[in-house]
Amino acid sequence: MRTREAIAYSNTLPRGAPTQDYPLVAWCDALVTGHADLGETLTNRSPEDTELVRLGRLEAQDFRSALAAAEPRQTAASKAAAQQAAAAAKAQWAPLLASQDEAARSQSFGLFYGLPGRCEHAARRIRNNITTPPATPADVGLEEPAAN
């Protein structure tokens, strides 16, 4: 677990993704929910597409349960950042969800490559109130420790 977490936290996040865990989980939830919502607009979903929607809903449920567990411990600023991050992610899906062009919606549904690996680790950390910094690649032996 520590090795996967170290790798996830060492990777650069996509443009627009929050760096703090609580807002990041809200952003991840909005992205995966938007993708599932888009998939549900398709009239001729393949079994694989239907499975992606199902898995997306499960992942979103996990993110929302983590957000709910962590919410009482968040500052007003963290909650506001989470709301802003979720709104920004939802806004990215809005034009596609409103589109009457099913072929374009289908193509966009197929282009969603998934969430950063950090999303699942951030959800675990906020759910379990883990406040220590995540492990680094050096901590888990993937890199040489920095020279002092």
Where are these regions (language model features)?
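Short amphipathic alpha-helical segments and their helix-coil junctions
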Residues: 1-17, 93-103
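Charged, low-complexity, helix/coiled-coil-prone segments
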Residues: 1-9, 53-64, 142-143
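Short N-proximal segments of mature Sec-exported proteins
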Residues: 14-73
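Compact alpha-helical subdomains of small soluble proteins
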Residues: 59-148
